[in-house]
């Protein structure tokens, strides 16, 4: 094709830039016509020497892209085929309640201007209502809507906000430091120096902002966290993140239930085991990589840095999109979610979910977090979901390829949320 081949790993991590470096002219033209809105919908490897992407341009044109991988793990050919139109993301998204608005807002936190969306009744005649801060997961890349670059717009925090509006609960969700309109702010020159303190500060500032709104009933405040956001929800509600208005209810939606680096280690070892079963790695190579991952975790916990020499690919385990900076990882790992949960004020109402289809962690691991909530004498509503993936969608498959599919949000979770709000907020 007249261009040097690009490693498959680079295509995966930096999809838009690396893909377009080798894309056919017709696809480049389509991308440019789409005002630069190239999105990765799914990625699969049907066999070890083939990577298949499905991508869209501006949500309209969809392409299936086959990228054969040579013996050195490099891509030297591209086959792209346009696909038929698919459903719009809006078709699976709960709608905002009539008479409610989603208002863009800003607030300050730690010297950074945070951009967010305040969802509330459009008329002051509605009086005061309960209100909740919504915290997303996945480090610095997930924005106020629960979306990340290079992925299908899942909009899971939009779904939660719209569900809350239907139940008469206002909400504030925001672009965390490093994401969306907020960006890196004063950390732009050195994002790796941010650590977790800015994320704690913005959670506290968000709750204070919400409590100041004229339509907010300050006696009925809540915080909901998804995935890694669950840790910050616990830090906020317990007061460990900083002084903030008292929270009456906490929602932990498929939260990280154990120390974060333990979770990274477990998921990495599971991936290596699967690769051996599929014939992609030898048992000896997988064992060597597993030992390197264990060394890397020990180093992060001891020094906050990775060892100088690691096998190819292991460092990327801790630097990939959605993981946060190394400093943030090492700092958030200090918190055992169960230990933080045990510090919640007694009788705090807590909605906790786990699912048999969450392939990040199972209900047995979430039981560890539940034990901490029990120790705190929380009013715990522990809901075991059936066939719901990590991103709150109906999907029993545990297939990561489906994370970027347009699937409906969980009706079980919606029912559990409605019941919890009616009883506790």
Task: Label each region the model flagged.
Residues 85-127:
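N-terminal cap/lid segment of alpha/beta-hydrolase-fold proteins
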Residues 124-164:
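Short, surface-exposed "cap/lid" segments of acyl-processing enzymes
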Residues 156, 192-213:
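Alpha/beta-hydrolase active-site loop
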Residues 205, 209-274:
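Primarily recognizes the serine-hydrolase "nucleophile elbow" in alpha/beta-hydrolase
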Residues 251-343:
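Accessory cap/linker subdomain of secreted extracellular hydrolases
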Residues 344, 351-354:
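Short beta-strand/loop motif that positions the catalytic acidic residue
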Residues 359-365:
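Conserved alpha/beta-hydrolase "acid-adjacent" motif
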Residues 388-392, 396-425:
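Catalytic active-site module of serine/aspartate enzymes centered on a nucleophile-bearing elbow/loop
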């Amino acid at each position: 094709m007249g261009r040097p081949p690009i490693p498959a790993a680079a295509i995966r991590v930096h999809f838009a830039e690396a893909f377009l470096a080798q894309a056919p002219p017709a696809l480049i033209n389509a991308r440019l016509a789409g005002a630069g809105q190239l999105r990765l919908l799914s990625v699969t490897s049907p066999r070890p020497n083939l990577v298949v992407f499905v991508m869209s341009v501006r949500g309209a044109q969809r392409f299936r892209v086959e990228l054969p991988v040579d013996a050195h793990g490099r891509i030297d050919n591209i086959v792209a085929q346009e696909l038929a139109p698919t459903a719009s993301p809006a078709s699976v998204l709960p709608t905002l309640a009539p008479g409610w608005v989603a208002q863009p807002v800003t607030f300050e936190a730690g010297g950074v201007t945070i951009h967010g969306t305040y969802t509330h009744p459009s008329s002051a005649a509605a009086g005061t209502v309960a209100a909740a801060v919504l915290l997303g997961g996945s480090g610095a890349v997930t924005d106020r809507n629960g979306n990340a670059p290079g992925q299908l717009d899942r909009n899971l925090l939009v779904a939660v906000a719209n569900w809350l509006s239907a139940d008469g609960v206002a909400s504030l969700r925001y672009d965390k430091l490093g994401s969306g309109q907020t960006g890196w702010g004063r950390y732009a020159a050195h994002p790796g120096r941010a650590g977790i303190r800015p994320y704690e500060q913005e959670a506290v500032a968000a709750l204070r902002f919400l409590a100041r709104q004229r339509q907010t009933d300050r006696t009925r405040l809540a915080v909901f966290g998804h995935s890694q956001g669950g840790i910050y929800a616990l830090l906020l509600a317990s007061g460990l993140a900083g002084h903030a208005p008292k929270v009456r209810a906490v929602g932990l939606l498929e939260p990280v239930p154990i120390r974060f680096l333990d979770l990274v280690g477990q998921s990495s070892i599971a991936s290596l085991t699967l690769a051996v079963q599929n014939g992609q790695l030898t048992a000896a190579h997988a064992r060597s990589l597993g030992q390197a991952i264990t060394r890397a975790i020990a180093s992060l916990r001891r020094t906050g840095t990775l060892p100088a020499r690691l096998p190819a690919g292991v460092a990327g385990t801790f630097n990939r999109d959605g993981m946060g900076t190394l400093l943030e990882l090492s700092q958030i790992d200090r918190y055992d979610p169960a230990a933080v949960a045990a510090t919640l004020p007694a009788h705090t109402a807590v909605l906790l979910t786990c699912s048999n289809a969450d392939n990040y962690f199972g209900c047995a691991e979430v039981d560890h977090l539940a034990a901490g909530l029990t120790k705190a004498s929380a009013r715990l509503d522990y809901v075991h979901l059936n066939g719901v993936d990590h991103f709150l969608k109906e999907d029993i498959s545990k297939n990561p390829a489906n994370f970027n599919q347009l699937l409906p949000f969980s009706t079980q979770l919606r029912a559990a949320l409605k019941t919890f709000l009616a009883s506790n907020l």
